[in-house]
């Protein structure tokens, strides 16, 4: 209903939600209460009551906050900024294939629209949000969101391993297609670009960008998962 349906102000389900479901869930709180609030917020958005909707979504997020270690995440990014340079890619020995195309960026930035437009070309295919690159990183022993591991992988990967990893990734996303370009739209691959560029130096990366205010408001008003 968030993406495809419209909730009318006179919808009996909405009336029941407000009169019975929300009061019964409020005391316990948690995910069920948060989901009910998000549904109410969606109805308020559809009715044009934007201020009320924003307050309702804020209540929903407070009812079921998503844990996040911002300090650890910042350290993961900063470690790469401080340690990795262009010189680390001068001897990139991975596969020279130009077939893979990554689309990365924020949710709600227009990435799906771009993917659909590109995939309309006869020589471009898409595998959607593939876990292939993240799975590949895990096989190297790289810990998730660990800056030191990422830097070590970029600097120390042997040429034979780089070739093997790149060919494995290409084979997984290619599947049965003969398209010249294959799109992988797993947005969180932006966290793995350092490794990706090392094993596939000729592959394209599209960084989707939308006005930051529009993007953040859109994300705030969507029922995004904790993954995002």
How would you describe each model-predicted region?
Residues 1-176:
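Alpha-helical solenoid repeat scaffolds of the TPR/TPR-like class and their adjacent stem/linker regions
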